[in-house]
């Protein structure tokens, strides 16, 4: 019976959608989810929530050369070995970064449910290359900052970091290279006591989900790497 604000869901989908500027993939997709089940009149019904996000800008022929020349750092070669050369190379198959679209859809719905219980989530670009943004205050994060970050297409606490970050991405692009970065995420309004011992702890469950996003190579909680 929870009522979903679908416009807010679409706002989050638009933030993820590619093709908006040079810091993202040039492929253009609207990322419009079509709900098949689990929602009636914007209210969750209790049935499994299922939506389809169609690919509209497809050029399958562009991937033909990857059968003989796999992309460095991508799944092409490992998928070739794992599936005995039967893998679908078009668009990366089920290893494609496009699969972050359904993650964003599910997250946008879950975020609204959590907010109704007083739990708020936000994230920002912490660094790109050697350019860094300011960090969250470890003791107090106000709602205005959370709202600002959640509506931004290039989420930063210190907006003066945007230009040097974009310049770093552009320099890497012109050099036909890539560049790494980090994201800092905060959760407010949650009580202690969630999770289970050992393998089902909150950090372990979150880490498993985060590593489902392509290109993630590390995660820390609090000041984990600095201690």
List each language-model region with its residue ranges:
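Generic N-terminal targeting/processing segments that precede catalytic cores or assembly contacts
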Residues: 1-227
């Amino acid at each position: 019976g929870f009522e979903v604000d679908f416009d807010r869901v679409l706002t989050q989908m638009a933030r993820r959608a590619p093709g908006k500027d040079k810091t993202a993939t040039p492929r253009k997709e609207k990322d419009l989810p079509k709900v098949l089940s689990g929602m009636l009149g914007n209210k969750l019904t209790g049935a499994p929530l299922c939506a389809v996000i169609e690919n509209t800008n497809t050029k399958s022929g562009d991937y033909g050369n990857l059968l003989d020349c796999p992309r460095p750092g991508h799944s092409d070669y490992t998928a070739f070995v794992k599936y005995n050369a039967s893998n679908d190379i078009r668009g990366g198959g089920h290893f494609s970064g496009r699969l972050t679209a359904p993650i964003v859809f599910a997250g946008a719905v879950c975020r609204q449910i959590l907010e109704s219980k007083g739990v708020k989530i936000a994230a920002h670009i912490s660094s790109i290359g050697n350019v860094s943004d300011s960090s969250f205050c470890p003791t107090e994060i106000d709602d205005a900052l959370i709202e600002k970050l959640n509506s931004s297409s290039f989420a930063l606490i210190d907006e003066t970091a945007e230009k040097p970050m974009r310049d770093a991405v552009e320099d890497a692009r012109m050099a036909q290279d890539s560049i790494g970065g980090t994201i800092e995420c905060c959760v407010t309004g949650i009580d202690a006591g969630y999770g289970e011992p050992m393998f089902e702890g909150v950090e372990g469950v979150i880490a498993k989900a985060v590593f489902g996003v392509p290109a993630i190579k590390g995660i820390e909680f609090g000041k984990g790497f600095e201690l």
